[in-house]
């Protein structure tokens, strides 16, 4: 049986629809059905479901809030929660697929130079630090794991940059978007398919990096221009100093 955590998030939802299309059986849980910060609750669900495969999509992703008011919740979900899931997965003999982030790196490589799986992590934010701790806990407690680092995730469900731009375009004729932060967007469908590909084909356990194919990095400005290309909204590039953020972007 397959178990999906964070099943109501944008990735968890995409994964559910993908498995539905394939007529695969699974159990989908979110915080109401299994609060991952509660070890007893996690163990109870695992004992009932008896999963052979766990897609751990649950995560705290409010990167700026994690620097202050959300710091405790960030740690509880990304560290304690991941530890609980990893321990339960190992106890019940399940393969664990854990979704991580580019925030585990410092983000100081030259533009266009990719981060490799064996590059040294050096998170610069609370969110990045808790996700890195989650990676270490998965590696510590699970003997059968896939850790997938991804970036700039967007899709048809949940909050993401695409929806934000589309919503702003309904009420603005001009939008300013930062043009000095570089990365590669990742579609939730691509990520969900890659997760299932690794697990179903029993690929080598370990770390993987995934984003959508691109000949070169893009910026949030470039991404916004592409999103709104069929509208009358003017998109203007600005320096990130115009939008101060609590958390440093990699």
Where is each model-derived feature located?
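NAD(P)-cofactor binding segment of oxidoreductase domains
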Residues: 54, 68-97
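NAD(P)-dependent short-chain dehydrogenase/reductase
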Residues: 136-183, 188-197
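Mid/C-terminal beta-alpha module of Rossmann-like enzyme folds, strongest
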Residues: 194-195, 201-246
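Adenosine-cofactor binding site in Rossmann-like domains, unifying the SAM/SAH pocket
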Residues: 20-44
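NAD(P)H-binding glycine-rich loop region in Rossmannoid oxidoreductase-like domains
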Residues: 40-77
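N-terminal Rossmann NAD(P)H-binding glycine-rich loop of SDR-like oxidoreductase domains
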Residues: 1-21
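Catalytic helix-loop patch of NAD(P)-dependent Rossmann-fold dehydrogenases
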Residues: 76, 80-84, 91, 104-148, ...
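SDR active-site strand-loop-helix element
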Residues: 5, 29, 54-58, 96-102, ...
